[in-house]
Amino acid sequence: MLVLGIESSCDETGLALYDTQRGLLAHALHSQIAMHRDYGGVVPELASRDHIRRALPLLEEVIAKSGARREDIDAIAFTQGPGLAGALLVGASIANALALAWNKPTVGIHHLEGHLLSPLLVAEPPPFPFVALLVSGGHTQLMRVTDVGVYETLGETLDDAAGEAFDKTAKLIGLGYPGGPEVSKLAETGTPGAVVLPRPMLHSGDLDFSFSGLKTAVLTQMKKFEAAQLSGDALARAKADLARGFVDAAVDVLVAKSLAALKKTKLKRLVVAGGVGANRQLRAALSAAAAKRGFDVHYPDLALCTDNGAMIALAGALRLARWPEQANVDYAFTVKPRWDLASLAR
């Protein structure tokens, strides 16, 4: 089965072709980071317009890279939610228009299920079951994954997502957009232990997260720097140490909760997915914990940590292989800007 995947939930337009026999044939991605940088964040209307401009050229690129023909495509998978309503509507409309023109079925995919399954695209994919740590700009969750469509929420953030905390911390420190990579880069130049920030809910006894207090602690430190009238090199060093303190605190919590989830489920495999899953400090800490405690940790390729069409094509192929009745052949569709991943559980 050859499936075309279309991702448009936020500020990346991604298309890909995935074959159930041959794997990922090709994928192409356009990021809108440069367009949104002057605004300090994603502007939904601009994002939607750009998806319209980019989708069809990316489709031609993917078809050319793969060597496949349009008539070879068996189905079209698209991100149905969660995400920005307008952006989702663009991707869904394009998917269903192509499907109608080509006489192909469609299937709507949960964006987070795509991330959840993205590590299956590597050369040696992890077998089921496993614990998944989903960490992105909008979501932070721990899930028990027994099979495709068999998900149990073990814990989730009670306020800010980890990626959101990274972005807000970057803004507080005065870094550019996108904030997550910038604060991580600055943290690598900071002195470990120079600034120690709280580890929210580290000892809460459950698997939930909270990052709003950590963000507030960063704001408090910045006010202290201002009161001390730091400037020049002294302020630059203080900001680097603060960034290091923030990243260390966030990573400590993510690692500790992941270890607790493995202990609770008695599983020996951890999958990490989502944009924050590309963070080098997080990967290093989890890999060190895995070596020490004897469990396996799996990540998607760095290029597939961000939103992408490959994960949507994969999820669509896996769903249609298991549940052919999910194929939509009447081309009526809805999008779901808010959509609980646990609601997919079968």
Swiss-Prot record:
GO molecular function: iron ion binding; N(6)-L-threonylcarbamoyladenine synthase activity
UniProt keyword terms in alphabetical order: Acyltransferase, Cytoplasm, Iron, Metal-binding, Transferase, tRNA processing
Chief location category: cytoplasm
Pfam families: TsaD
Positions with a binding annotation for substrate: L134, V135, S136, G137, G138, D167, G180, N279
Superkingdom of the organism of origin: Bacteria
Catalytic activity: L-threonylcarbamoyladenylate + adenosine(37) in tRNA = N(6)-L-threonylcarbamoyladenosine(37) in tRNA + AMP + H(+)
Class in the EC hierarchy, top level: transferase
Binding-site residues for Fe cation, renumbered to this chain: H111, H115, D307
EC number: 2.3.1.234
Keyword Cytoplasm applies: yes
HAMAP family associated with the record: TsaD
UniProt similarity note: Belongs to the KAE1 / TsaD family.
Job of this protein: Required for the formation of a threonylcarbamoyl group on adenosine at position 37 (t(6)A37) in tRNAs that read codons beginning with adenine. Is involved in the transfer of the threonylcarbamoyl moiety of threonylcarbamoyl-AMP (TC-AMP) to the N6 group of A37, together with TsaE and TsaB. TsaD likely plays a direct catalytic role in this reaction.
The protein's name in its UniProt record: tRNA N6-adenosine threonylcarbamoyltransferase
Lineage summary: Bacteria, Pseudomonadati, Pseudomonadota, Betaproteobacteria, Burkholderiales
Gene: tsaD
